[in-house]
């Protein structure tokens, strides 16, 4: 999530000064904006990964896991993003971990206005299993690889993060291809336009923002690979944007982002697809696409048909590119 206005609010329970003081301290690290000044007063640990530096700090509070386990989780996530983009998308990023009740990652928000930053609300009872299963950190780190866009184009930012996150984790060896293709078959229909919907720019619902944006990415990935003989895909387009200086610390119009991505692949796929999906609702035949990609989901596990016409494209999408 980017610069979310919603955040976990920890209630102040009137149990005396001992309870009120920690609550006040905790509130300094929550809210709509990233607490840059408060962060910079905290002791931070540096993690070097993907040519970048992660500055990791913890808001007051305790975790069942040692802090080095949480730091290792961040490093693993950053490595996955670095594999996908060829490097980590920004030179440095502040990462603030705020303890919350319960277990698991409760929320993540990325920021870029005063330097790349990510705030994570993490359950204080989290286990290593919770961290291994988490997708939020890779999602938020992926946001750092795209310039900030005006609100009507939020679907592009959330769609890229939704689409890239599982692929990056497959390329890093943290997920299986069968897992993520099964998830796509299950979830991608959430992005289809409903009755009365407009294009992606004009339908800011949850499904259209996240899964409509992810559907744009999938269609673009497949079409780029068709037009380039499977020599390039969306991954090369997104790497091109990062190499051109595009990241969340910048604010770019969507046309510039798409043009740079298209230039990186030698196609016009992103601009053409935006012309088709930006203003008007577009509903591709997903069932036909899954068949062509050779993805079948029945009662049991996902199966692949490697004789399907687009099976080489399916395999290439999750393969680590050379170089």
Predicted regions located by residue number:
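Juxtacatalytic substrate-recognition/specificity segment
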Residues: 43-149, 153
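Boundary at the C-terminal end of the N-terminal hydrophobic targeting segment
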Residues: 17-25
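Beta/coil-rich, acidic/histidine-enriched accessory regions frequently appended to metallopeptidases
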Residues: 2, 6, 247-323
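Long, contiguous juxta-domain segments that are non-catalytic but functionally important
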Residues: 26-40
């Amino acid at each position: 999530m980017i610069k979310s206005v919603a955040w976990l609010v920890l209630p102040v329970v009137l149990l005396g000064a001992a309870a009120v003081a920690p609550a006040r301290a905790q509130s300094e690290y929550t809210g709509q904006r990233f607490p840059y000044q408060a962060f910079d007063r905290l002791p931070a640990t540096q993690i070097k990964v993907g040519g970048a530096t992660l500055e990791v700090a913890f808001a007051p509070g305790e975790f069942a896991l040692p802090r080095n386990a949480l730091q290792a989780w961040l490093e693993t996530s950053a490595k996955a993003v670095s594999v996908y983009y060829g490097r980590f998308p920004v030179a440095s990023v502040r990462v603030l971990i705020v303890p919350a009740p319960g277990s698991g990652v409760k929320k993540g928000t990325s920021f870029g206005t005063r330097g790349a930053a990510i705030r994570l609300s993490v359950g204080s009872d989290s286990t290593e299993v919770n961290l291994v299963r988490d997708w939020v950190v890779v999602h938020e780190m992926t946001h750092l690889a795209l310039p900030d866009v005006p609100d009507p184009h939020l679907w592009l930012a959330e769609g890229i993060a939704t689409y890239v996150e599982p692929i990056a984790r497959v390329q890093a060896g943290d997920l299986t291809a069968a897992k993520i293709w099964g998830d796509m078959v299950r979830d991608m229909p959430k992005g289809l336009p409903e009755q009365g919907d407009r294009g992606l720019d004009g339908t800011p619902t949850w499904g259209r923002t996240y899964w409509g944006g992810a559907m744009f990415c999938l269609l673009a990935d497949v079409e780029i690979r068709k037009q380039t003989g499977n020599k390039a895909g969306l991954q090369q387009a997104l790497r091109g944007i990062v190499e051109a200086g595009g990241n969340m610390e910048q604010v770019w119009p969507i046309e510039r982002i798409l043009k740079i991505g298209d230039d990186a692949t030698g196609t016009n796929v992103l601009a053409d697809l935006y012309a088709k999906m930006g203003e008007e609702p577009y509903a591709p035949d997903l069932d036909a696409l899954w068949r062509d990609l050779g993805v079948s989901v029945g009662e049991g596990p996902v199966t692949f048909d490697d004789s399907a016409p687009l099976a080489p494209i399916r395999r290439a999408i999750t393969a680590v590119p050379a170089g």
